[in-house]
């Protein structure tokens, strides 16, 4: 039973041995949201002996008291951040997305769910995953809760399709494997030239950034960026850039504000008639641009050197 306002929870449960009964009181003075800690403890005690429960909560921000019928009790004070408890509770209630869920996502993509809605049944999926129907169903639910999968329950199964986030998650996994098996990771991105808002000119010329550009990139960039709108295919491929080691431009601050870091990926720019390098794809940590927007810096004004106008298509070769 939960007492409103006090954030104290009580529950009764078997210790797991069948011979002892425990009264459980869990007090949490730090959580900013209502988490049913007692239920979490109760489930743990039902499955495991008391010492196992004690170990399970050793890194949680709660005070848990297990009291036997004879009146003997022990209390453990937990002082770690609340995120630890939230993470454990999420794992125990099936909210996390781990390697098993990613394996399921990959299997669905291989079935065609990357490009269109695909019908699946939990029984068939469970057999292919070597898991129970309940486990397969839980994995689908976790993927949906995480925004990686869209589901529609129909009379004879489920229609599933990877979301944009789901596709990017697999692209990121793919990029990791490329780093393992390929010595020189690379990705080609296609986009059309667009006009920016002029923000690139302002930020590039700030001393805190410009000094690092010169030192770490080996050139003084032109005061402005080449803005590109990527094709749908290149938006999907963009996650592969995580396999490439960027040049980090550190964040800094002045008397008025702080400025976030940026990451520069070595690149060359291919226009209709010529190719230009050196250049860098710049990815500020703080940006209002979406995944479809790409910014490129170079020592010269790329529009003039490559004779580009809005709407022209270019290919950005990003590599280490």
Curated annotation (Swiss-Prot):
Region (H-T-H motif-like): 1-186
Cofactor remark: Binds 1 Mg(2+) ion per subunit.
Coiled-coil annotated spans: none
Region Riboflavin kinase, residue ranges: 187-320
Alphabetically ordered keywords of this record: Flavoprotein, FMN, Kinase, Magnesium, Metal-binding, Nucleotide-binding, Transferase
Residues binding FMN, per UniProt: 287, 295
Positions with a binding annotation for CDP: 196-201, 300-303
EC number: 2.7.1.161
Entry cofactors: Mg(2+)
GO molecular function, one term: riboflavin kinase activity
Catalytic activity: riboflavin + CTP = CDP + FMN + H(+)
Record GO biological process: FMN biosynthetic process; riboflavin biosynthetic process
Listed Basic residues bias regions: 1-10
Pfam families on file: CTP-dep_RFKase, HTH_20
Low complexity compositional bias, start-end: 11-23
Associated pathway: Cofactor biosynthesis; FMN biosynthesis; FMN from riboflavin (CTP route): step 1/1
Top enzyme class: transferase
Domain of life: Archaea
Region (Disordered): 1-25
Claim: Kinase is one of the keywords in the record: yes
Protein's UniProt keywords contain Kinase: yes
Family of this protein: Belongs to the archaeal riboflavin kinase family.
General function of this protein: Catalyzes the CTP-dependent phosphorylation of riboflavin (vitamin B2) to form flavin mononucleotide (FMN).
Protein name: Riboflavin kinase
Organism: Haloarcula marismortui (strain ATCC 43049 / DSM 3752 / JCM 8966 / VKM B-1809)
